[in-house]
UniProtKB/Swiss-Prot annotation:
Descriptive protein name: Plasma membrane ATPase 1
Organism of origin: Nicotiana plumbaginifolia (Leadwort-leaved tobacco)
InterPro entries reported for this sequence: ATPase_P-typ_cation-transptr_N, ATPase_P-typ_cyto_dom_N, ATPase_P-typ_P_site, ATPase_P-typ_TM_dom_sf, ATPase_P-typ_transduc_dom_A_sf, HAD-like_sf, HAD_sf, P-type_ATPase_IIIA
Localization in the cell: Cell membrane
Keyword Nucleotide-binding attributed: yes
């Protein structure tokens, strides 16, 4: 057998045997395995033959990848400048501009090298993170069930498939109940197909119902999915981030093009300038105006941010999900496990018994029999844990068949034989589902609902238990009449940090809505305990097939937008809630864990698979949590906003620099016919690139509200700040070249109306002035308040100091004839630093003015909150948090907007007294709104004239 085995497996490898269609016994024979699975040694040997169970990744050439960083619109402009330097500049009696050509190529290589190294590091980090999300499979090895990476599966392995699993390899099903399999990803079939014992299932399809064991028949590239993947290449969609990047790049390129056209028209036909100096001036605009490092800075910032998120317990599967997370303003959160601990307890004293001759202990035993003893969920563990010995759940009986939980039936069931050989069946699950089974439903329905409501008022979930005899003795038979025997109360305590996290979320402008499958009263009680509000609706009344007539005339979208949560939610309702919130222009996040949550997770702007989610939910999500609880999501929101803030800061900076270089040097060239050496612009660009890379690790204050790309804000701020810097350079040039101001005030050597040779010193002075103030601009764009108040990252400061020290040394000492500059000495260097410092201060005021003009709120930062004029730490933080909370509750219709209460008050003392009373009333109202059931609902009632309490009471599930 040992000699024959490799040959047989070789036949399987070459697909000479049709394992998909031959009888199942022959499958075992051909794969040389049994239903007891493989040994670890045999599996290792087969791994060497068949390879890993994953698709071959196309390895890109590292050289081509490196050169790829030089192939984008921004690099094309630089490459055009390099060609200009040796082709077009070769005239006017002068040789080609080799130093500029070499400088441009050096800049491109430096930029590509940084991009290559950073992206390689980010790629390695991303690969390590994605490895944590690698699909797992339950496999029988050495006679024991183990959880292994799906990548190590081999033909002949016995695997277990259950609800929510993505099937890890092509397999044939063994004995058991039929499965419902969703093959839409492979075949396009919209409805799940039923697969029974002996049928084949494909890798990549999803188990929608049932549980069964299967034998693996093909892995990796030999699977149906693997062969299909070889035929088609995945298409890369252009994401929103890429569109923004393109828009900013195009703006910079167009600005340069406009500047060059104006220069060409004025210099040659009007001023009749010499050919070669004109080309040099055009090169200055081309080289200095292009933000060559922009793609690198932004992608590296996102990659580093993604790694930071992973450390916090949120793994991003799609990089651009970070920008969506930063803009998220509504989060629909599961209750169980996210807002609560998902650690259930049962109070035996509260158990209600509905059958004669049955006591509370018997109800617990029957519920335990309808539970798993292995691979338990939270409910199974809580119920089996109530027994003195967990083995009692199967003591004295023989298990015939177990029906696992699924979202449709919402119950589990066990068919078993007792010691006398009689067959029985016991089921536990959602009370409504169990009640529907009962033969005497009409007799007990009122009492059952009364008990459920009594439990719900105390925040307790209910679990129904029913029992039947199966006289036919077959597991397939319907059995005798079901007897409803009892209701168990389940308590799932809220997480200790949930209430505080919800308060933080509201202060950050994120409205948290509870989405729960539990009944309305439980949702309201949990909402009350967490301080998130009790303005909740039964989702079936709003979104179900049979919407209630009394609220059908009401604006459903508006009710959904203003609701604090939804109860009795089915997976299809989640999808509808997300869709309607998006229609109201909200950036919506949705948490989920089950296979049926996948459509809602895909539809949401940010699909969040919670800790312990099924493979299907993880596959559909954008972010996968590795820790439980809402606090992970809110931390991820803050981190995402910080990442987004860094990217936004850089884009404003990049646009500003383009405008300042193009406008500043164009005016110098056209007004005073000053030819700035292109090589020195290259030096500025190289030093800038080195410094600006550190922005990806800068210390920033996240936006206090959801943020998104606002191109109008970026371009307006960039144009105004860039225009200001350009004018400062023009004024400096005029003062140094046309007046005696600096020599008179500071005692430095004069540059006034100097000879042409001394343009070299003027070039050095302009170089230093442009270099310092251009790079210092990053400190203005990175801060929301005064730039000298918000402490920047250590790396950014060090990089700035080193770069400007180098720039100062070049300006002071360099006598480079090839670059047409001459050292200006320490006196002029000091003058330039002072000049830049004086004209740096108005940059913050201009920033506030732009923000005020765009939003009308910027002066709040300076005057109302006074954060710029105090040395106190966190001055006014509490008041600001309350203001944000107030603004958000007003936005979502949860309190009446501000009105001018004191318009008629004329007496100053009276006004003060009124103000104090109003403050006290406002604080009482705020606390009441946060902590009482009535406070949350009354504003909606007032605004809409709706009797919301009546609506809610009429639809208690």
């Amino acid at each position: 057998m040992g000699e024959e085995k490799p040959e047989v497996l070789d036949a399987v490898l070459k697909e000479a045997v049709d394992l998909e269609n031959i009888p199942i016994e022959e499958v075992f024979e051909n794969l040389r395995c049994t239903k007891e699975g493989l040994t670890a040694t045999a599996a290792q040997e087969r791994l060497a033959i068949f390879g890993y169970n994953k698709l071959e990744e196309k390895k890109d050439s590292k050289l081509l990848k490196f050169l790829g960083f030089m192939w984008n619109p921004l690099s094309w402009v630089m490459e055009a400048a390099a060609i200009m330097a040796i082709a077009l500049a070769n005239g006017g009696g002068k040789p080609p501009d080799w130093q500029d050509f070499v400088g441009i190529i050096t800049l491109l290589i430096i930029n590509s090298t940084i991009s290559f190294i950073e992206e390689n590091n980010a790629g390695n980090a991303a690969a390590a993170l994605m490895a944590r999300l690698a699909p797992k499979a339950k496999v029988l090895r050495d006679g024991r069930w183990k959880e292994e990476d799906a990548a190590v599966l081999v033909p002949g392995d016995i695997i277990s498939i259950k609800l929510g699993d993505i099937i890890p390899a092509d397999a044939r099903l063994l004995e058991g109940d039929p499965l419902k399999i969703d093959q839409s990803a492979l075949t396009g079939e919209s409805l799940p197909v039923t697969k029974g014992p002996g049928d084949g299932v494909y890798s990549g399809s999803t188990c929608k119902q049932g549980e069964i064991e299967a034998i693996v028949i093909a892995t990796g590239v030999h699977t149906f999915f693997g062969k299909a993947a070889h035929l088609v290449d995945s298409t890369n969609q252009v994401g929103h981030f890429q569109k923004v990047l393109t828009a900013i790049g195009n703006f910079c390129i167009c600005s340069i093009a406009v500047g060059m056209i104006i220069e060409i028209i004025v210099m040659y036909p009007i001023q009749h300038r010499a050919y070669r100096p004109g080309i040099d001036n055009l090169l200055v605009l081309l080289i200095g105006g292009i933000p060559i490092a922009m793609p690198t800075v932004l992608s590296v910032t996102m990659a580093i941010g993604s790694h930071r998120l992973a450390q916090q317990g949120a793994i991003t599967k799609r990089m651009t999900a970070i920008e969506e997370m930063a803009g998220m303003d509504v989060l629909c959160s599961d209750k169980t496990g996210t807002l609560t601990l998902n650690k259930l307890t049962v109070d035996k004293n509260l158990i209600e018994v509905f059958a004669k001759g049955v006591d509370a202990d018997m109800v617990v035993l029957m519920a335990a029999r309808a539970s798993r003893t292995e691979n338990q969920d939270a409910i199974d563990a809580a119920i089996v844990g109530m027994l003195a010995d967990p083995k009692e759940a199967r003591a004295g009986i023989r298990e015939i068949h177990f029906l696992p939980f699924n979202p449709t039936d919402k119950r589990t069931a066990l068919t078993y034989l007792d010691g006398e050989g009689k067959m029985h069946r016991v089921s536990k699950g959602a009370p409504e589902q169990i009640l529907n089974l009962a033969h005497n439903k009409s007799d007990i329905e009122r009492r059952v609902h009364a008990v459920i409501d009594k439990f719900a008022e105390r925040g307790l979930r209910s679990l129904g238990v029913a029992y039947q005899e199966v006289p036919e003795g077959r597991k397939e038979s319907a059995g005798g009449p079901w007897q409803f025997i009892g209701l168990l109360p389940l308590f799932d305590p809220p997480r200790h940090d949930s209430a505080e996290t919800i308060r933080r979320a509201l202060n950050l402008g994120v409205n948290v809505k509870m989405v729960t499958g539990d009944q309305l009263a439980i949702g309201k009680e949990t909402g009350r305990r967490l301080g998130m509000g009790t303005n909740m609706y039964p989702s079936s009344a709003l979104l179900g097939q049979t919407k209630d007539e009394s609220i059908s005339a009401l604006p459903i979208d508006e009710l959904i937008e203003k609701a604090d949560g939804f109860a009795g939610v089915f997976p299809e309702h989640k999808y509808e809630i997300v869709k309607r919130l998006q229609a109201r222009k909200h950036i919506c996040g949705m948490t989920g864990d089950g296979v049926n949550d996948a459509p809602a997770l895909k539809k949401a702007d940010i699909g969040i698979a919670v800790d312990d989610a099924t493979d299907a939910a993880r596959s559909a999500s954008d972010i996968v949590l590795t820790e439980p609880g809402l606090s992970v999501i809110i931390s991820a929101v803050l981190t995402s906003r910080a990442i987004f803030q860094r990217m936004k800061n850089y884009t404003i900076y990049a646009v500003s620099i383009t405008i300042r270089i193009v406008l500043g040097f164009m005016l110098l060239a056209l007004i005073w016919k000053f030819d700035f050496p292109p090589f020195m612009v290259l030096i500025i660009a190289i030093l800038n690139d080195g410094t600006i890379m550190t922005i990806s690790k800068d210390r920033v204050k996240p936006s206090p509200l959801p943020d998104s790309w606002k191109l109008a804000e970026i371009f307006t701020t960039g144009i105004v700040l860039g225009g200001y810097l350009a004018m400062m350079t023009v004024i400096f040039f005029w003062a140094a070249y046309k007046t005696n101001f600096f020599p008179h005030v500071f005692g430095v050597s004069t540059l006034e109306k100097t000879a042409t040779d001394d343009f070299r010193k003027l070039a050095s002075a302009i170089y230093l002035q442009v270099s310092i103030i251009s790079q210092a601009l990053i400190f203005v764009t990175r801060s929301r308040s005064w730039s000298f108040v918000e402490r920047p990252g250590f790396l950014l400061v060090i990089a700035f100091v080193i770069a400007q020290l180098v720039a100062t040394l070049i300006a002071v000492y360099a006598n480079w004839s090839f670059a047409a500059i001459e050292g200006i000495g320490w006196g002029w260097a000091g003058v330039i630093w002072i000049y830049n410092l004086v004209f740096y201060i108005p940059l913050d005021i201009i920033k506030f003015f732009i923000r005020y003009a765009l939003s009308g709120r910027a002066w709040d930062l300076v005057f109302e909150r006074r954060i710029a004029f105090t040395r106190k730490k966190d001055f006014g933080k509490e008041q600001r948090e309350l203001q944000w909370a107030h603004a958000q509750r007003t936005l979502h219709g949860l309190q009446v907007p501000d009105t001018k209460l004191f318009s008629e008050a004329t007496n100053f003392n009276e006004l003060n007294q009124l103000a104090e009373e109003a403050k006290r009333r406002a604080e009482i109202a705020r606390l009441r709104e946060l902590h009482t059931l009535k406070g949350h609902v009354e504003s909606v009632v007032k605004l809409k004239g709706l009797d919301i309490e009546t609506i809610q009471q009429a639809y208690t599930v």
